[in-house]
Amino acid sequence: MTRRIAATVILALALAPLAPAGGPVYSRFALGDILHFGSNRAYAMGITGVAFTEDGFVNIYNPASLSRLSLTRFTGGFEYVNSSIEDAGGSQRFATGSFQSLALAIPASSDDGIVIFGAVTPYSLVDYDVVVQETVAGSASTQTFSGTGGVSTLSLGTTYRPVTDLSLGLTFSYHYGAIQHRSKVDFADAAFADNELRTSQFLSGTSFTFGMTYGGLSSLLGTSSLQPLTLGLVLTTPATLSIKEERFLLTQRTADTSLVRRGTGSLPFRWGLGAAYTGAALIVSGDLVVEQWSSADFFDPPAVEVNNSLRAGLGIEFPARRDPTSYWERVAYRTGFAYHASYISINGQPVNGWSVSGGIAFPIGPDARMNLGLQVGSRGTTDNGLSKESFFKLSLSIDASEAWFLTIEED
């Protein structure tokens, strides 16, 4: 009888919102933390890069931004995150590192702006570990909640430039991944059997992204002051996810229950707008991205309220000089600010955040750079029994072209 009670308790705990615990609990809900990564350059400027269109950079958030590449380019990156979680019970610090991106873009026709590209990036991330001391069914207990995994995206796409000032892009994305949650209860009273519930979800689905950039406002309006201005648009279709869930309930002595379920969920429609003013000595860019999570479907009803999300950012870059006389004049400097209204609310309280960013691009060879990006900010609040996360993020990437491998012979 006590084992049945304990099993019922842990199943209820696994589906309920967490009490204050001092852990990074927000990635526990729905599909986890949603990531918006276009490039390390955009990362350091606090934006996604919806309106970027320059040669020499791979920014995958808007496929149209690749249409001006003149050489085959590749990029790969890694992110380190150090965060402090604070709630009414105190604070804890966590650190983790993860893969950030890998992309390759190959120009097929520079005259027509045709570029073929592929990329692998994380779409969402689940990474939490929380311990709660609580009395359950009259017995003191230690409850452990943890989760890992997320959704990744494999993208293949192409671009086309029908006229000089208009670039178009189309991306096919295959979303895949696995998310594991673990809920464990250890009882102080030997009359209760310790229990552990392991849940694994395996997800897959597809979507399309259409992108466009336009730099012809100067000609359209007859003013040369707008010549450096580019506008960007990106639209991503909803994705239907096929989901297989495996649940495994263990007690102190035996594996009690194994359950496999199949169903569907979805990723939401996403749209973004951006603008970039590209001068010789200063680049200013801003963008806005909205995801309609309120219309998305979930395999199980989330234990939190789901809202449409919004991400807005504004950044500047001091690019490398075109006629450098020293190494440091070949270095680019970046900074920016971002605000994020997330797609979840808990107890009526939105989980929103902000960040200040910066970065440096160091030349490391012919047409190759090592990019460092930094973000410092916070999300959430300690109001209404919730947690506040203060974070420090560091991104490192290598961006290079085929010119990196050329051997230059000296006379």
Which residue ranges define each predicted feature?
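Bacterial N-terminal signal peptides that target proteins for export
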Residues: 1-7
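Short alpha-helix boundary/capping motifs
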Residues: 16, 73, 185-187
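N-terminal, post-signal peptide beta-strand-biased segments of exported outer-membrane/organellar beta-barrel
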Residues: 18-122
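Outer-membrane beta-barrel porins/channels
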Residues: 22-44, 105-411
